[in-house]
Amino acid sequence: MDPTQNTSAGIGGSNGTIRYQTNDGTSTVTVADDSKENLSQVINSIEKTLGVLHQLHLTVTSFTPASQLHLLQRLNSLVMELDNMTKLSEKCNIQIPMEVLNLIDDGKNPDEFTKDVLNSCIARNQVTKGKTDAFKDLRKHILEELEQNFPDEVDMYREIRASSAAVTKRLAQSQSVLPNGDAKVKNEL
């Protein structure tokens, strides 16, 4: 292959995007940027459609036989913009929960749904934290009881735990793994 040709290679980017870089060092648009651009185009089309609907409303409310041509032009403009919006929306893949759509249909604020979801997550997190704390307290209590009755075995247990933790920590550092199990990722800019 001729080295002067521009071939593309996919390079992993941050936050789940794919960045393509050519041999000459230039990079093309990311996948996330494409979806943002598509969404922006759909939003602009919706705004244009709303503007055309407003103009159509004004034309209809002040309709006279002489303004019939103007009304037909506005209707054609609305049909063209709705067609454009449909074509643009096919490029967007956005999933909206049915609960949000039902709230909108009921005339309620969809932010309430988001607030309720966050509050339920916080509540479940608190329950999980409570369970974790209860297990920590139980472990601490059992170790205290065992230490009173079997001090030598508890000392051996603590030595084994300490050496095991040290080995795990060294292994994690050598493999670039965070203590919580996540892998370290180098940012590519």
From Swiss-Prot:
Alphabetized GO MF terms: transcription coregulator activity
Pfam families: Med10
Location of the protein in the cell: Nucleus
Keyword Signal: no
GO CC, one annotated term: mediator complex
PANTHER family listed in its UniProt record: MEDIATOR OF RNA POLYMERASE II TRANSCRIPTION SUBUNIT 10, MEDIATOR OF RNA POLYMERASE II TRANSCRIPTION SUBUNIT 10A-RELATED
Subunit structure: Component of the Mediator complex.
Family: Belongs to the Mediator complex subunit 10 family.
Name of the molecule in the record: Mediator of RNA polymerase II transcription subunit 10b
Organism: Arabidopsis thaliana (Mouse-ear cress)
